Regions:
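Short acidic, hydrophobic short linear motifs in intrinsically disordered regions
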Residues: 22-31
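Short amphipathic alpha-helical interaction segments
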Residues: 33-49, 54
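Short helix-capping/hinge SLiMs at alpha-helix to coil transitions
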Residues: 16-20
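Short alpha-helical segments that sit at the start of domains
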Residues: 1-13
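Short, amphipathic alpha-helical interaction segments positioned at domain boundaries
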Residues: 68-88
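Short, Lys/Arg-rich nucleic-acid/phosphate-binding segment
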Residues: 56-68
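Residues marking the start of alpha-helices
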Residues: 1-2, 30, 69
């Protein structure tokens, strides 16, 4: 089990993505009320840590690609992410 600490922006995006279905970047931006640059930067940090995956797969998502890309939580870290959100 991994001890995950999330920043406020990261926790907001993890809650918005949820644990069931992938969510499009445009929906994430609308739901979180964050700037597109902030959403993209935060998603890239979560993706580099392996906590979030993009569909289609990207190592790093660009600002122009973010709204039309789907994002989902990595199922291998789902339990750890739930605990990280619970501790907040």
């Amino acid at each position: 089990m991994r001890n995950i600490k999330l920043s406020g922006r990261e926790a907001t995006l993890v809650r918005a993505i949820g644990f069931t279905e992938p969510m499009m970047g445009a929906e994430l931006q609308d739901q979180t009320h964050m700037d597109s640059e902030d959403v993209t930067d935060t998603l890239n940090s979560l993706m580099s840590a392996g906590l979030v995956e993009s569909v289609p797969y990207y190592d790093e998502v660009q600002l122009a690609e973010m709204p039309v890309t789907a994002f989902e939580l990595n199922p291998a870290y789902a339990q750890d992410l739930r605990q990280a959100l619970y501790r907040r």
